[in-house]
Amino acid sequence: AGGQTGETAPSGEEISLSEEETVASEPSGAPAVSLKEDFSGVLFIGDSRTVGLSEYGDLGQAEVFADSGMSVFTLFNKTVKLRSQEKSGLEELLCSRKFDTIFFMLGINELGYDYDSIVKQYKRTVEKVHELQPDAAIVLGANLHVTAEKASGSSIYNNDRINALNRDIKSMAEASGYVYLDVNQVFDDENGNLAAGYSSDGAHVLGKYYSVWVDWIRETLGTHAG
């Protein structure tokens, strides 16, 4: 599932976003991304973390194409229930509607695959999305880190592998004129792991922190009235 609903906070304090934590990597030549306040014209594509953003954060009028098991290997083969409650495949959705901005955040479910095949399929998948929506600004989201405890118990789902994939995603964004957005700076501990107090399962933030994540997206990219 997307979010964890516990109420534990790492230090009993609410997160406040510093100026340093609201900086996106926006390559030169990338289209300017400015979101409408109600997120209309925005599409979020992703896995369980995006499901969490949809269920626990306020994505307003955004469309969401996300599923807990989603990966770049299954993205164009799955159907998902949209805001309208109708089911749709991604290609059908991208061919029938026009989006201003598309957020793309996948990668954690892919980590068990051969690494080179992950990067190649990720690139192919993003390129296909862009071909179907050539006028949309593409935002590639870094994969959220896991906690130190979660990482220590797995040779696959650990932050070394997540960081390697995130570096390749960032390079892809820079090479293709997309925007790269890394939320880990908001939720990491001092050692670069997902801070344990933000999570109960080691891989997702608690339900209440998805609204912090959405606020960070708004502050980082900026919003304007429709």
Task: Please provide the spans of the model-predicted regions.
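N-terminal secretory targeting modules
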Residues: A1-I45, T50, S54-E55, A225
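Conserved SGNH/GDSL esterase-like catalytic core that processes O-acyl groups on lipids
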Residues: A32-Q121
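A generic secondary-structure signal
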Residues: E92-L93, R124, K128-V129, W216, ...
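Alpha/beta-hydrolase-fold catalytic nucleophile elbow
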Residues: M105, G141-A142
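Charged helix-capping and loop-helix junction motifs
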Residues: S117-T125, N159-N163
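A short helix->loop->beta-strand "cap" motif at the edges of active sites that frequently abuts
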Residues: Q133-A137
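Catalytic His-Asp segment of secreted/periplasmic serine-dependent ester chemistry enzymes
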Residues: V146-G226
